[in-house]
A protein has these predicted regions:
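The feature captures the beta-strand-to-loop junction immediately N-terminal to the Walker
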Residues: 38-40
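Helix-to-loop junction immediately C-terminal to a conserved catalytic motif
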Residues: 53
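Conserved ABC transporter NBD signature motif
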Residues: 61-70, 80-81
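Catalytic Walker B motif of ABC-type/P-loop ATPase nucleotide-binding domains
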Residues: 176-180
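Conserved catalytic motifs of ABC-family nucleotide-binding domains
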Residues: 172
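Conserved ABC ATPase "signature" region
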Residues: 114-147, 195-198
Length: 254
């Protein structure tokens, strides 16, 4: 792994109606890592992810993605820079096929602008062919190729998690934020999903994930960060964090 962080969060603050959800939180994620973010419900984890992804504007602090300062940028600009996020509850387009869900998530698709259908029809057609080819590559990677023409609403919970990750990969991200990627997924598919994430990491991607499954966190993450009451209270290798008295008291429950 490179020595400098791919993501640097400095003193981020966010309050909702006087309740401070994120309280001067600072952390870093190294490139090529699988970094876990844990903490009790209400610790501010998902709020922090939404701030990083541009869905919430912070009240204070800075966020750097590589050399780019991204706090306050709209989500689509952050995605273009190479950072994307999946959702704890998949946001699939239920009435479209699995393949169509991926095509719509493709990066730099000329068909996104209606006017191009009239002034650049050839470019739109070429982009559609390119996006469909890329979508099939991703579906093969995520083992959903056999479901390409099925409606997304017909997928199981675990398959929808794979679809969510597949859609994220269509933007060719460098860093992927995963919000509880194995929540509600059966043990067999959990193993397959984490194997896939490990394979993607080996191919150059970085993952920062929120997860409550301690088996996944302790066995699959290189580094673990712990939040409590909006702040980072501990970080380190999984075995170190697991033995930290502050973590045991606030989250792991002894």
């Amino acid at each position: 792994m490179a020595s400098g962080p791919i993501l640097q969060v400095n003193g981020i603050e966010k309050a909702f109606g006087g309740i401070r959800a994120v309280d001067r939180c600072s952390l870093a994620v190294l490139p090529g890592s699988i970094t876990g973010l844990i903490g009790p419900n209400g610790a501010g984890k998902s709020t922090l992810f939404n701030i990083i992804a541009g869905l919430y504007r912070p009240d204070g602090g800075e966020i750097w993605f590589g050399d780019a300062r991204i706090d306050g940028l709209p989500p689509y600009e952050i995605v273009r820079l190479g950072l994307t996020k999946t959702w704890q509850i998949p946001h699939e387009l239920r009435n479209l096929t699995v393949l169509e869900n991926l095509v719509l998530a493709a990066k730099d698709n000329a068909g996104e602008r209606l006017i191009n259908l009239f002034i650049k029809p050839g470019e739109v057609k070429r982009d559609e062919i390119r996006c469909r080819a890329r979508a099939r590559e991703v579906l093969k990677l995520t083992q959903l190729e056999g479901l390409a023409n099925e409606h997304a609403r017909s997928l199981s919970g675990g398959q929808k998690k794979l679809l969510e990750l597949s859609r994220a990969l269509m933007s060719d991200p460098t860093l992927v934020l995963l919000d509880e990627p194995v929540a509600g997924v059966n043990p067999a598919l959990t193993g397959s999903l984490m194997d896939l994430i490990e394979k993607l990491r080996q191919n150059g991607r970085t993952f920062f994930l929120i997860e409550h499954d301690m088996n996944v966190v302790m066995n699959r993450c290189d580094w673990v960060i712990v939040m409590h009451q909006g702040r980072r209270i501990a970080e380190g290798r999984p075995e170190t964090v697991k033995a930290d008295p502050a973590v045991i008291e606030s989250y792991l429950g002894g």
